[in-house]
From Swiss-Prot:
<dbReference type="InterPro" id="IPR007379">
    <property type="entry name" value="Tim44-like_dom"/>
</dbReference>
<comment type="similarity">
    <text>Belongs to the mitochondrion-specific ribosomal protein mL45 family.</text>
</comment>
<dbReference type="InterPro" id="IPR032710">
    <property type="entry name" value="NTF2-like_dom_sf"/>
</dbReference>
<dbReference type="Pfam" id="PF04280">
    <property type="entry name" value="Tim44"/>
</dbReference>
<keyword id="KW-0809">Transit peptide</keyword>
<keyword id="KW-0687">Ribonucleoprotein</keyword>
<protein>
    <recommendedName>
        <fullName>Large ribosomal subunit protein mL45</fullName>
    </recommendedName>
</protein>
<dbReference type="GO" id="GO:0005840">
    <property type="term" value="C:ribosome"/>
</dbReference>
<dbReference type="InterPro" id="IPR051975">
    <property type="entry name" value="mtLSU_mL45"/>
</dbReference>
<dbReference type="GO" id="GO:0005739">
    <property type="term" value="C:mitochondrion"/>
</dbReference>
<dbReference type="GO" id="GO:1990904">
    <property type="term" value="C:ribonucleoprotein complex"/>
</dbReference>
<keyword id="KW-0689">Ribosomal protein</keyword>
<keyword id="KW-0496">Mitochondrion</keyword>
Length: 361
């Protein structure tokens, strides 16, 4: 078509006619505007197919189109209901019929239950404790880091601690200077209640987090505690206030108190054997005790929550049942193995005689 139009222009030079070309798309497509019936969908590109939008060369793209779908075997609703009511034995048999290992590919149904409370937090908000002795000026970097941490700690004590507690109803006159006497009383009452196995008094003096740690000591044993005296006046080293869950307004306050006391402590097992400490020996103990209060409510009470163990605190005394041998005790120990009278040969001979007697009879 295009060639014929160009030839005509060259063959008639006397008549000045402008060259005009018309582009006709020879593509076989159902949306070609030149064919209104196909464009509107009246006729089909492939008359053998009911769908008007199928490709002209259907065989070429049939495999590709078949890969677009994925067949998934889904169990019926009745089968699901039946499986949910099956006991473990029948469920195991059903899985074995399908060729599945119930102990490898199917986890057993386990029921886990845990107590949740929003009046306490299961942990300590800020376990940082400022060091007892300041660092020397020989190492300037360490001294600078220590001073920086001390200033940050004091700022957080006011900003995220005392200032936030005083905004709560019933705590407008809160003062950390008068709190130490109350903390010492709570500390002694909590240990006396643990010694007497008084759960009601323990829940008044300690939180759920502390109860889970202290109760096993008296559940299968006994504790003897006596607070002899207070060596140094107790002082508050950290005050923190936070809300649980976050941004909920359910504020909980924690105060860390340094307590230097002289006390007697003895821990016995269920048979009456001494495990730790002594009822007669007095010891000086330095502890960093954490007290907690649910200040979101007006009638919140301060309770013992836990303890912080800094790096410079001396390790606890070992138990009396297991201890490390001294060099003298290790030298006395005999490393030679002794033969045990198992009487294996005698038992074999007796069994042989019984068998012969049974055969003869």
């Amino acid at each position: 078509m295009l060639g014929r139009a160009l030839i005509r222009t060259f063959l008639s030079p006397t008549v000045p006619v402008a060259a005009c070309t018309t582009q006709i798309a020879g593509v076989h497509h159902h949306k070609e505007a030149g064919d209104m019936k196909r464009f509107t969908g009246v006729t089909r590109s492939n008359k053998a197919k009911a769908n008007r939008n199928t490709h002209v060369n259907e065989k070429l793209f049939r495999k590709m189109r078949g890969r677009k779908t994925l067949l998934v075997e889904l169990p019926e609703d009745s089968a699901r209901e039946r499986e949910s009511e099956m006991p473990p034995g029948e469920m195991r048999t059903e899985l074995l019929k399908r060729g599945l290992n119930p102990y490898k590919e199917a986890q057993p149904r386990v029921w886990n239950e845990a107590q949740v409370t929003f009046q306490s937090i299961y942990g300590i908000a800020d376990p940082y404790v400022p060091p007892e002795t300041p660092a020397s000026f020989t190492d300037v970097n360490n001294k600078f880091d220590e001073v920086k941490q001390r200033l940050q700690h004091k700022f957080y004590n006011w900003r995220m601690g005392t200032n936030r507690i005083r905004k709560k109803q019933g705590f407008e006159k809160f003062d950390v200077k008068t709190f130490c006497a109350k903390a010492e009383d709570i500390y002694e009452r909590a240990h006396k209640a643990m010694e007497a196995r008084d759960k009601k008094e323990m829940y008044r003096c300690i939180t759920e987090y502390a109860f889970a740690k202290m109760w096993p000591d008296v559940e299968n044993g006994s504790v003897r505690f006596e607070l002899v005296s207070i060596v140094e006046p107790s002082r508050v080293v950290a005050v923190r206030c936070f809300d649980n869950p976050p941004k909920s307004g359910n504020d909980i306050a924690q105060i860390t108190v340094r307590m230097h006391t002289r006390q007697k402590l003895a821990l016995y097992d269920r048979f009456g054997g001494l495990i730790l400490g002594s009822e007669d020996e007095e010891k000086d103990v330095v502890e960093y005790v954490v007290f907690e209060n649910h200040i979101a409510v007006v009638d919140g009470e301060w309770r013992l929550h836990g303890k912080i163990y800094p790096k410079w605190i001396e390790p606890k005394q070992g138990t009396h049942i297991t201890h490390q041998l001294t060099q003298k005790e290790a030298g006395v120990q005999v490393a030679k193995a002794n033969a045990l009278p198992l009487r294996t040969t005698e038992k074999l001979e007796e069994a042989k005689k019984e068998k012969e007697a049974a055969n003869s009879s």
